[in-house]
Amino acid sequence: MTSMIPETKITAVRNTLQITFGVNEFEDIRQLTAGLSSALIFRIVVLGKPYLLRVITRTDEISNPSHYYSCMKPAAEAGLAPHIWYAGIEDRISITDFIEAKTFPVSVARMKMPGVLKRLHSLSPFPYRVNFFDFVDGLVRKFQDTKILPGNMTEDLFHLHAKISSVYPRNIQDMVSCHNDLKPENIVFDGDRPWLVDWEAAFLNDRYMDLAIVGNFVVKNDQEEKEYLTNYFDEDVNEYQHARFFLMSQVLHMSYFTFLLLQVSAGNKPVELNSAIPDFREFHDQMWAGKITLENNEARQEYALVHMQQLRHNLNTKRFEESLYIVSNY
């Protein structure tokens, strides 16, 4: 069964098991392939109990888990992430509790996730890495330079994004500890409560980023948005908070759209524009149900275009202009 572990990591994994559990073999192993992490993820059984084994095979500095662990550990101590049994920086191996995933109804997630996010955002500040707006602005410039799509298809979107970028607050004192990658496979529901996993993208960020990511999956109309944000803030939500949420949602659409198409184009695959673009809500419902993953370029391209279509729709609504006005005059 150790054949699943890269030969260069077998000794380190055995040492980890010995240090952690007093044995040097596991009883069962199964590789988990959901998600886009470059690390190898396994469900292992040791002394009759399942655990999650994460093995980072890359040796470059960008794969150094120091930052990842510095965010995961306080989250685990707060009961937001699974218990950590081992987290080695030099060997780049970690072992945590394995949470058996149960179906997480969207209606239940809409009620439970705001409280989880509020607890996450109340943790001591994670390390600062980058301003998310600066990151997205960089994606836009790179996208324009590579000319992945004709300019007449995207020029209006980039122009309107610039309007958001010019008015949206970037006050670092207002930033909180964020996960930044709360897609369905990183939210594991055990039948009672959700656990947050895969902390590679965590850093100090705008709270509305996490709220918008989860909102893509659980908020379907204005009333649900009101309930969702009210549950997070524990008070009636004002027009400024609604406007911040809406504008950050558009920035999120832009980031997915540009990042994923840049990723697809890096493989020298032309963007297919003749196929019908799926409905935003239906696509996210399928992702939430685990029926769609982003493991291949076809799915990533489709998801990018889903976000582009939704972004175009939202930027042409009355709410967009109202939100710009509210935030710029707050």
What are these regions (language model features)?
Residues 21, 79, 117-125, 168, ...:
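A general structural signal marking secondary-structure boundaries and capping sites
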Residues 23-33:
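Short secondary-structure junctions
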Residues 31-135, 140-155, 170:
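ATP-binding pocket architecture of kinase catalytic cores
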Residues 38-48, 52-53, 162-211, 223:
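Active-site acidic catalytic loop and adjacent metal/ATP-binding pocket
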Residues 58, 101, 194, 202-204, ...:
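Activation segment
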Residues 92-95, 182, 218:
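Short glycine- and hydrophobic/aromatic-rich loop-to-beta-strand nucleating segment
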Residues 208-240, 250-269, 280-293, 299, ...:
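Active-site activation/catalytic loop segments of kinase-like enzymes and analogous catalytic loops
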